[in-house]
């Protein structure tokens, strides 16, 4: 019997997804305005977040539910290390630090892993499915905006172990639907996914100060004034 979790997550996070895509930093990024100093701080935050998520998922490799959604092909830690080496140099570990919003995000991942590991599914869904869905578009924007013509700095968006991203996403969603969870657990996973979108938004918002310094408040306001319809909202409309 299907849990219908994939559709619950898609419908239940639609508003949060759209809100995240309307954060100023994200809107500027999608319009091709990316400032390298801000972007590398985001990469550093992602390194801590994905490291925590992947470590905690691995801790539950024998869990009857969490283990089903733990696909090693999705792991981003190693690709983020490559990007950090590019943006910061060989001693990147000595230079990066976790922002307050990033720290709250990591703490939440550690907390639910210890108390209700099924909720890790929400964080996997929020990050990995988004990475697969928009990865190539974001990669191309980053390459153009930051003049990354040497093929480096975008390893995060490359899934070397996934040959067909569309087929993999379908498999991922099917796996969500096959999870042996009750309705209450499914609802808590949807709630946690909405919280995860909120934590991502806070990380993006932290970066807006640096971006405004780089491009100026007038341009920032021009780029972010109009509300953008989110990807999930457009899909529903179609």
UniProtKB/Swiss-Prot annotation:
Family matches, as SUPFAM superfamilies: Heme oxygenase-like (SSF48613)
Keyword Repeat carried by entry: no
Main EC class the enzyme belongs to: oxidoreductase
Coiled coil location: none
Pfam families, per database record: Heme_oxygenase
Catalytic activity as recorded in UniProt: heme b + 3 reduced [NADPH--hemoprotein reductase] + 3 O2 = biliverdin IXalpha + CO + Fe(2+) + 3 oxidized [NADPH--hemoprotein reductase] + 3 H2O + H(+)
Family annotation (PROSITE patterns): HEME_OXYGENASE (PS00593)
Disulfide bridge positions per record: none
Gene Ontology molecular function, alphabetical: heme binding; heme oxygenase (decyclizing) activity; metal ion binding
Record GO biological process: heme catabolic process; heme oxidation; photosynthesis; response to oxidative stress
Domain of life: Bacteria
Family of the protein in this entry: Belongs to the heme oxygenase family.
Protein name (record): Heme oxygenase 1
Native source organism of the sequence: Nostoc sp. (strain PCC 7120 / SAG 25.82 / UTEX 2576)
């Amino acid at each position: 019997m299907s849990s219908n979790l994939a559709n619950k997550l898609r419908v239940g996070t639609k508003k949060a997804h759209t809100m995240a895509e309307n954060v100023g930093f994200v809107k500027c990024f999608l319009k091709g305005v990316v400032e390298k100093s801000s972007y590398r701080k985001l990469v550093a935050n992602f390194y801590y977040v994905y490291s925590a998520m992947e470590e905690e998922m691995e801790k539950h490799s024998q869990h009857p539910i969490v283990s089903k959604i733990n696909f090693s092909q999705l792991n981003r830690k190693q690709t983020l290390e490559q990007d950090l080496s590019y943006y910061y140099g060989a001693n990147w570990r000595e230079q990066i630090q976790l922002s307050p919003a990033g720290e709250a995000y990591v703490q939440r991942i550690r907390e639910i892993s210890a108390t209700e590991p099924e909720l890790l599914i929400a964080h996997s869904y929020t990050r990995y499915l988004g990475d697969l869905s928009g990865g190539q578009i974001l990669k191309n924007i980053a390459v153009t905006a930051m003049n990354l013509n040497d093929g480096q700095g975008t390893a995060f968006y490359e899934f070397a172990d996934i040959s067909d991203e569309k087929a993999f996403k379908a498999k991922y969603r099917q796996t969500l639907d096959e999870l042996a969870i009750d309705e209450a657990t499914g609802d808590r996973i949807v709630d946690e996914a909405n919280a995860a979108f909120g934590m991502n938004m806070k990380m993006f918002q932290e970066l807006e100060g640096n971006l405004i310094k780089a491009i100026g408040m007038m341009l920032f306001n021009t780029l972010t004034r109009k509300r953008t319809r989110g990807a999930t909202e457009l899909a529903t409309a179609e």
